[in-house]
Regions:
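Detector for small/aliphatic-rich hydrophobic stretches
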Residues: 1-2, 17-136, 140, 146
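Non-catalytic, conformational "gating/processing" segments within enzyme and secreted inhibitor domains
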Residues: 84-263, 283-385
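Soluble, non-membrane globular domain cores that form compact, hydrophobic packing
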Residues: 271-275, 428
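Extended hydrophobic
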Residues: 173, 230-231, 235-253, 383-426
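Conserved structured core elements
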Residues: 30, 49-53, 68, 167, ...
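Sec-dependent N-terminal signal peptides
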Residues: 5-14
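Short, positively charged
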Residues: 19, 23-36, 367-389, 424-428
Length: 428
């Protein structure tokens, strides 16, 4: 039987999927996002960056077209019920209206593809567009890339490469995501200075290190700017974004001294992961106002943060082996069942490949992050002490992520390993 291929596009970090990654250590369970990230780290030669949310959005738009064992395997990879959701809090609340934050999905289909009415109803009337994959592959790829660039603030370009596409591709599913937001508690540019960052290989590099005092309580003055975490040698800090309801949280986590990043990620349990997320995303519910007779400023909890100013971007990452390693195997083979989606008469559809590309910039005033994904078918250890509070400097490799606590969704995550020594990150 001949199969036509669908193309799904994902925007991830710079990883090559030549091998299926080993399973986690026995007894170490992990949520889907962490399993995915472990797989990405296997072939990485440096910093890693992915957008779990962008990948999952593409799979959610594929799932209504899947049936049988293919549907079961895809649903098992996805967090939650796997259904298409249009009411994400970070995209529909106060935050999305005050900051630049959006996510879009599009299905590019050749005119030879017959999509079923039930599938088109499930994905929405505006989700499908035509592209001439059979007649002019280069033009179809140009249309996909242009759409991805437009919907990521022009940060993601050339998502698809015509030379990497199957000549039997007739359909591509794409997600594009863009976030530009400001810290609730901003860094002062005059406080940024070059400081030493030590890579895992022992090389010492100079990076522009931002600095600020972050209050962990208070809603007016002082204003809560983030949270601090310390347990079993693991230290972390978070920074909140301005924007109100639905605002995600930026988090950075240092492994225990002497532990390699991969060893730290591979050994993390689901309980530890959830503890870090819940502790670092806890916003202060108390109405605190400094006024005569009120609590003195020095009695507020706080921590002192030094964080590199950095940028990361990834080349296009192939996700096929990663998804196969997570149990989604049939969709890429002749066993694929996308009968609920449609066909390229008289041939059924299967997935040929999946690709993702990401970019992020962390600055004194805030950050911007973008991702695009395409699919191709052929507990807290306690509050910091009162007074001055602890100091935390991210001067060695760390894990970072952007997390939506109300949606329980990891939007972006990555590791920062530092620049190549001799290659400057930028002036302070």
């Amino acid at each position: 039987m001949i199969f036509r291929t669908l193309a799904y596009v994902f925007l991830l970090g710079s990883v090559s999927w030549a091998d299926i990654p080993p399973a986690p250590s026995p007894g170490v369970s992990a949520p889907p996002e962490l399993c995915l990230f472990r797989a990405c780290m296997e072939k990485s030669g440096g910093s890693v960056m992915i957008s779990p949310f962008s990948l999952y959005e593409v799979l959610r738009y594929m799932l209504p077209g899947a049936a049988g064992e293919t549907e079961k395997q895809m649903a098992a990879v996805l967090p939650g019920d796997g259904k298409i959701r249009r009411n994400w809090t970070f995209l529909s609340g106060d935050f999305s209206r005050s900051q630049r934050c959006y996510s879009a999905n599009r299905i590019f289909a050749d005119r030879s593809v017959e999509l079923k009415d039930a599938y088109k109803k499930a994905v929405g009337p505006d989700a499908v567009a035509q592209a001439p994959f059979r007649e002019n592959m280069a033009e179809a790829v140009r249309q996909v890339n242009a759409w991805a660039a437009t919907n990521t603030g022009n940060r993601i370009r050339n998502l698809l490469n015509p030379q990497r596409m199957s000549d039997r591709t007739v359909l591509v599913l794409v997600n594009a995501m863009y976030l530009r937001a400001f810290w609730d508690s901003k860094f002062e540019g005059r406080d940024t200075a070059l400081r030493t960052f030590v890579r895992e290989d022992g090389a010492a590099c100079q990076v522009p290190m931002m600095k600020q005092q972050v209050f962990t309580e208070g809603r007016s003055w002082p204003r809560q700017g983030g949270m601090y975490y310390e347990k079993d040698g693991v230290r972390g800090a978070s920074l909140f974004f301005t924007g109100g309801k639905g605002a995600p949280v930026f988090m950075a986590v240092l492994p225990p001294e002497g532990r390699k990043m991969k060893q730290f990620i591979d050994g993390m349990t689901e309980e530890e992961w959830n503890g870090i997320l819940s502790s670092l995303s806890a916003r202060d519910a108390a109405e605190e106002t400094r006024k005569p007779g009120g609590k003195p400023l020095e009695q507020y909890s706080r921590y002192h943060l030094r964080l590199p100013r950095f940028s990361q971007s990834s080349p296009t990452l192939s996700l096929k082996k990663a998804l196969e390693a997570l149990g989604m195997e049939d969709a890429f083979t002749g066993r694929a069942d996308f009968s609920r989606m449609g066909s390229c008469a008289p041939e059924p559809l299967k997935i040929h490949g999946g690709y993702q590309k990401c970019a992020v910039r962390v600055r004194e005033e805030g950050l911007d992050a973008s991702a695009s994904t395409a699919g191709e078918m052929d507990p807290f250890a306690g509050a910091p002490p009162r007074g001055r509070g602890p100091e935390i400097e991210f001067n060695r490799p760390f894990l970072w992520l952007i997390y939506s606590p109300e949606d329980r969704a990891v939007l972006f995550m990555g590791t920062y390993e530092g620049p190549e020594c001799g290659k400057k990150e930028g002036k302070p």
